[in-house]
Amino acid sequence: MTIIRKKHPLIKIINHSFIDLPAPSNISSWWNFGSLLGLCLIIQILTGLFLAMHYTSDTATAFSSVAHICRDVNYGWLIRYMHANGASMFFICLFLHVGRGVYYGSYNMIETWNMGIVLLFAVMATAFMGYVLPWGQMSFWGATVITNLLSAIPYIGTTLVEWIWGGFSVDKATLTRFFAFHFILPFIITALVLVHLLFLHETGSNNPTGLNSDADKIPFHPYYTIKDFLGVLILLMAFMILTLFFPDILGDPDNYTPANPLNTPPHIKPEWYFLFAYAILRSIPNKLGGVLALILSIVILAFMPLLHTSKQRALTFRPITQTMYWILVADLLILTWIGGQPVEYPFIIIGQTASIAYFAIIVIFMPMAGMIENDILDLD
């Protein structure tokens, strides 16, 4: 068996990635989220495949086909709610995974980090298009508002929006192409994940100290396979509690009303995982400025290696930057809350303050804190 594992051209790739992979001996539970994201992706692809067997991407029947899945298909209600809440679990794991990367300075593995940012954009695009498919009120108006943002691009904006819509408004052509893209993107994401892992295995994993761990490596199997399995059990437990007891808690009641172009919902808002970016978008009165801020809120992650001023990699032994980091986390929670609130006083000013704070902490305060910590170290 050992000979096959190490010699077979296909199995040896799996062996070098998941079995004999040298891993740091001290990586904590924060390193479990990679495998959990892999699990989420598998769940989403499988449930999505079964949903696609019964779904029809036509404006006249899309809403009814989702109702048919929930009422008439064997365990269709379970598949539908697993897919909808699976997206939420996916984003929870994604945010924690990125947050771990920022905290422990994993962004210094530049290729892996940039691939991760591409993956984040791909997953966000997939989730957005998936939200349009049930063709409820929030699906329709969310698609209208978000795609309409592209009209802020000078000269070609309006033409670009109509090209994406396939007409002069969000309609049958839009729904059909969104379904096609929503179906193909997860497979593209799977390919990108393999590239992400390829880059990761070039350098090896980071660890909680931020120090080089080449002198102290252990095999991935059985130590981290069993550890990942515990994470999988906890995730599945939380996932099934969410899906079976509170299936609609993260959804919007407006999406149980069929799409109606003549009736605008009182508050148009995206799913909870986009609310922080939506709050940043809304906090700038200018349309183009808002769109740029929205894009920059994610793209700014790519600049983190350039903004790293400290002599140490991780925040483990850096209390000043740690404080900045947790203020940033709190700020993101505030932005998420604001994104779901109506555009009125005092929410507007809170959103604007939180948006400025978000960029200021990343671009100004965290690099400054790093330099101050360097000076404190030099005093010794």
Curated annotation (Swiss-Prot):
Q: What is its main location?
A: mitochondrion
Task: Spell out the subcellular localization from the entry.
Answer: Mitochondrion inner membrane
Q: How is the cofactor bound?
A: Binds 2 heme b groups non-covalently.
Keywords for the protein's UniProt record, in alphabetical order: Electron transport, Heme, Iron, Membrane, Metal-binding, Mitochondrion, Mitochondrion inner membrane, Respiratory chain, Transmembrane, Transmembrane helix, Transport, Ubiquinone
Show the stretches that span the lipid bilayer.
33-53, 77-98, 113-133, 178-198, 226-246, 288-308, 320-340, 347-367
Q: Which Gene3D superfamilies match?
A: Cytochrome Bc1 Complex, Chain C
Q: Where on this chain does a ubiquinone bind?
A: 201
Which cellular components does GO assign to this protein? mitochondrial inner membrane; respiratory chain complex III
Tell me where on the tree of life, at the top rank, the source sits: Eukaryota
How this chain assembles, per its entry, is:
The cytochrome bc1 complex contains 11 subunits: 3 respiratory subunits (MT-CYB, CYC1 and UQCRFS1), 2 core proteins (UQCRC1 and UQCRC2) and 6 low-molecular weight proteins (UQCRH/QCR6, UQCRB/QCR7, UQCRQ/QCR8, UQCR10/QCR9, UQCR11/QCR10 and a cleavage product of UQCRFS1). This cytochrome bc1 complex then forms a dimer.
What is the designated name of this protein? Cytochrome b
What is the source species?
Microtus ilaeus (Tien Shan vole)
Q: Which gene encodes it?
A: MT-CYB
